[in-house]
């Protein structure tokens, strides 16, 4: 198994684990992004509203498609990002291992743009379905077709299944409907670019600082590699880099979410921005920002740690498997 494939597997599993841990925040932040200023709710009110109308499980609506989406997204992204990273490092004349020094800013941006663009074009249909699941609700009916109500007599709401959403998109917009919001989604390629470029720079600064404390310079054989970073290093660097990325690109996240949810009749990304500014002001482009920052920062922090641990675990399994084969061949 190639190093890039191991990174892809680790990113896929690590991202899924992080998503599962923080999914209620993912769900709430998506809903907050598509609500208008008139509908704006506090986090506590949003949680209470979901539980009242959909039950506790409403906080996990769309979880299955999200886990599938993040697994595919991270797998594709890490595969291409690591391939680009290895290629760029080989151009320096170095060996592309996990302990190789960090990418330069230009290299990080290039690797991120290529990996992010490929990933976005490939996985946009998955996120269109997930967003629709998380933001749409239909009236619950029993076996006889009668409307189900709660203790207060209000109609119960249920979330549509992924299959139901797929059918609705096909009936309404055809195949092109799965690429709703692709414009802002491609612009949002900048999010992981900023995230990973910031992460690489923070790694470089941290390792350089530690070398300076040892009285060495970060060049040649004395350079520390990324393998010297602790889990806490990865957690905080991952969180900080995601904070920077999400803060800078959030208005596009709002526009993309609204286009994918199809809860607002916007004909294009530009018209969506103009309509939001006219109806809700600048604050409309930052609807749900607090929740999104909390969710994305925690998800990224957990993901960076999980990805590294899974990567190391798989590498050890491969080494052990190779050693066993050698022993068997000698017998």
Model-derived features: where do they sit?
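Matrix-facing interhelical linker segments
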Residues: 1-331
């Amino acid at each position: 198994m190639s190093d890039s494939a191991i990174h892809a597997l680790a990113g896929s599993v690590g991202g899924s684990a992080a998503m599962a841990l923080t999914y209620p925040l993912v769900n709430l932040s998506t809903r907050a992004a598509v609500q208008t200023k008139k509908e704006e709710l506090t986090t506590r009110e949003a949680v209470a509203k979901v539980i009242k109308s959909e039950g506790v499980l409403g906080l996990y609506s769309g979880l299955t498609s999200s886990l599938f989406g993040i697994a595919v997204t991270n797998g594709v992204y890490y595969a291409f990002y690591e391939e680009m990273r290895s290629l760029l490092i080989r151009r320096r004349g170095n060996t592309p291992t996990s302990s190789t020094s960090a990418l330069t800013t230009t290299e990080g941006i290039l690797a991120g743009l290529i990996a992010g663009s490929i990933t976005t074009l490939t996985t946009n249909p998955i996120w269109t379905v997930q967003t629709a699941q998380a933001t749409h609700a239909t009236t619950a009916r029993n076996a006889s077709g009668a409307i189900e109500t709660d203790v207060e007599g209000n109609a119960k709401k249920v979330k549509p299944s992924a299959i139901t959403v797929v059918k609705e998109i096909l009936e309404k917009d055809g195949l092109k409907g799965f690429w709703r919001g692709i414009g802002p989604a491609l612009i949002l390629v900048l999010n992981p670019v900023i995230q990973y470029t910031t992460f690489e720079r923070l790694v470089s600064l941290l390792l350089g600082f530690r070398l300076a404390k040892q009285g060495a310079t970060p060049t040649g054989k004395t350079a520390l590699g990324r393998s010297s970073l602790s889990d806490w290093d990865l957690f905080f660097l991952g969180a900080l880099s995601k904070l920077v990325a999400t803060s800078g690109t959030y208005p596009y996240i709002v526009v993309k979410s609204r286009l994918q949810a199809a809860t607002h009749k916007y004909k294009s990304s530009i018209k969506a921005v103009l309509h939001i500014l006219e109806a809700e002001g600048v604050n409309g482009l930052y609807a749900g920002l607090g929740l999104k920052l909390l969710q994305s920062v925690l998800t990224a922090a957990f993901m960076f740690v999980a990805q590294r641990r899974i990567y190391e675990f798989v590498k050890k399994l491969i080494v052990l498997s190779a050693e066993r084969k050698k022993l068997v061949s000698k017998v």
